[in-house]
UniProtKB/Swiss-Prot annotation:
Its EC number is 1.1.1.145, 5.3.3.1. This is 3 beta-hydroxysteroid dehydrogenase/Delta 5-->4-isomerase type 2. InterPro entries: 3Beta_OHSteriod_DH/Estase (IPR002225), Lipid_A_modif_metabolic_enz (IPR050177), NAD(P)-bd_dom_sf (IPR036291). SUPFAM superfamilies: NAD(P)-binding Rossmann-fold domains. It comes from Mus musculus (Mouse). Gene3D superfamilies: NAD(P)-binding Rossmann-like Domain. Belongs to the 3-beta-HSD family.
Length: 373
């Protein structure tokens, strides 16, 4: 295959950075354009220090700026779109999430058509499939089953509609007369070094004598390591550029999991951090059905107050459902079409993440010492 170029949106994020680390090892890749609204100074420095002969171009711009996106896409062979706002708590305004996650994706698709970019890979989420009820049980689900989120909450809704737009755009005619090929990857809940979620959990625990706050002791999920999700994106990029593989991939979506054991959100947090003295909150928890109806009451209060005051409930029905359901998926379709096999084993992923948590503990030891006095 001839030399090619790749644009990665959300490149300064948790997943985006890992994709870049793998992309620089790709043969025949001539240029990587890394795009984000703002890059942290340390992230920008890491990009400049990458040991590679591949040209790395750092671009700061807004995904809602259509003209900027069109310029960023000029001469690009593959777009990997990871940029998104992830919020299931209701802290970020609904319209902001819809603008970035849905409108931004639509803008990028149009930029690809105008700039004649032939391949588009969308980082979707398992949230587009559900769960829709804490009573729902999906074990090792797969793509042939019909699972679609019915939540109107901005994150799952925006990701679902963005994925639909991406898959519907497959086969669109490009400005140069070519054809746009698209696919979507639906990773499970992602863990690993530099995870913002894990970082927040650990820092919060350090402020509470090492007790991990409960985020879901009743659910069953299959978390996926960030390095394996990044690897799936690399394989999708290869696949869409391969004339033999592409017909089976374009217009398709894939669940991305790995060999991490099925467990609750609380269990994964504890397993990854117990080496550093963290423990689970042993206090009594309300049953999920009661939490669900309490969440409904809090959401009702929020709605009634909305004309005069923006009240953000401490939890909502969507969050309760996520933390109380059984919802796991197989990666067999990705294995079949993309040639996906987890690059990193569970044991290695656990070790790497635990070691990183150790560095967090070291950085915040002063906080821990102060609390324990």
């Amino acid at each position: 295959m001839p030399g090619w170029s790749c644009l990665v949106t959300g490149a300064g994020g948790f997943l985006g950075q890992r994709i870049i680390q793998l992309l620089v090892q790709e043969e025949d890749l001539e240029e990587i354009r890394v795009l984000d609204k703002v890059f942290r100074p340390e992230t920008r420095k890491e990009f400049f220090n990458l040991e590679t002969s591949i040209k790395v171009t750092v671009l700061e711009g807004d995904i809602l700026d259509t003209q900027y996106l069109r310029r960023a896409c000029q001469g690009i062979s593959v777009v990997i779109h990871t940029a998104a706002i992830i919020d299931v708590t209701g802290v970020i305004p609904r319209q902001t999430i819809l603008d970035v996650n849905l409108k931004g994706t639509q803008n990028l698709l149009e930029a690809c058509i105008q700039a004649s970019v032939p391949a588009f890979i969308f980082s979707s989420s398992v949230d587009v499939a559900g769960p829709n009820s804490y009573k729902e049980i999906v074990l090792n689900g797969h793509e042939e089953e019909c699972h679609e989120s019915t939540w109107s909450d901005p994150y799952p809704y925006s990701k679902k509609m963005a994925e639909k737009a991406v898959l519907a755009a497959n086969g669109s005619m490009l400005k140069n007369g070519g054809t746009l090929q698209t696919c979507a990857l639906r990773p499970m809940c992602i863990y690993g070094e530099r995870s913002p979620l894990i970082s927040n959990i650990i820092i919060m625990a350090l402020k509470h004598k090492g007790i991990l706050r409960s985020f879901g002791k009743f659910n069953t999920a299959n978390p996926v390591y960030v390095g394996n999700v990044a690897w799936a994106h690399i394989l999708a990029a290869r696949g869409l550029r391969d004339p033999k593989k592409s017909p089976n991939i374009q217009g398709e979506f894939y669940y991305i999991s790995d060999d991490t054991p099925h467990q609750s959100f609380d269990d994964i947090s504890y397993t990854l951090s117990k080496e550093w003295g963290f423990c689970l909150d042993s206090s009594w928890s309300l049953p999920v059905p009661l939490l669900y109806w309490l969440a409904f009451l809090l959401e009702t209060v929020s709605f009634l107050l909305s004309p005069i005051y923006r009240y953000i409930p401490p939890f909502n029905r969507h969050l309760v459902t996520l933390s109380g359901s059984t919802f796991t998926f197989s990666y067999k379709k990705a294995q079949r079409d993309l040639g996906y096999e987890p690059l990193v084993s569970w044991e290695e992923a656990k070790q790497k993440t635990s070691e990183w948590i150790g560095t967090l503990v070291e950085q915040h030891r002063e906080t821990l010492d102060t609390k324990s006095q």
